[in-house]
């Protein structure tokens, strides 16, 4: 399970840290909008006019309103991406390589 979260944790943490507005689409088609306030292994706390606890198993898609840099510079298996932890070092922007043709 740690392997699956190695993508979602840095992504959600970047959304939370940068306060990026997001649209979250649920599997039943409902669209929720707000900012990621916090998250854990099972839920995302989405804040708009109220805070909503959204279970991850009900989420189909998370769409940020703008691009975010979510590459993790931490070794795999690290659990430093959960809400409440402080990054140990400032994140440096990285560029995706588009060498594939």
UniProtKB/Swiss-Prot annotation:
Protein name as catalogued: RNA-binding protein Hfq
CDD domains: Hfq
RNA-binding keyword on record: yes
Lineage: Bacteria, Pseudomonadati, Pseudomonadota, Gammaproteobacteria, Enterobacterales
Compositionally biased intervals (Polar residues): 70-86
Entry-linked Gene3D superfamilies: 2.30.30.100
The species this protein was found in: Yersinia pestis
Keyword RNA-binding assigned: yes
Region Disordered: start-end pairs: 63-101
Disulfide bridge positions per record: none
Subunit structure and binding partners: Homohexamer.
Molecular function via GO: RNA binding
Keywords noted in UniProt: RNA-binding, Stress response
């Amino acid at each position: 399970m740690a392997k699956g979260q190695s993508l979602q944790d840095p992504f959600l943490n970047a959304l939370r840290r940068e306060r990026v507005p997001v649209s979250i689409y649920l599997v039943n088609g409902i669209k929720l909008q707000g900012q990621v306030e916090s998250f854990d292994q099972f839920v995302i706390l989405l804040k708009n006019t109220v805070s909503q606890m959204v279970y991850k198993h009900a989420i189909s898609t998370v769409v940020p309103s703008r691009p975010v840099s979510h590459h993790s510079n931490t070794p795999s298996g690290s659990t430093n991406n959960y809400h409440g932890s402080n990054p140990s070092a400032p994140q440096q922007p990285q560029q995706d390589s588009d060498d594939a043709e």
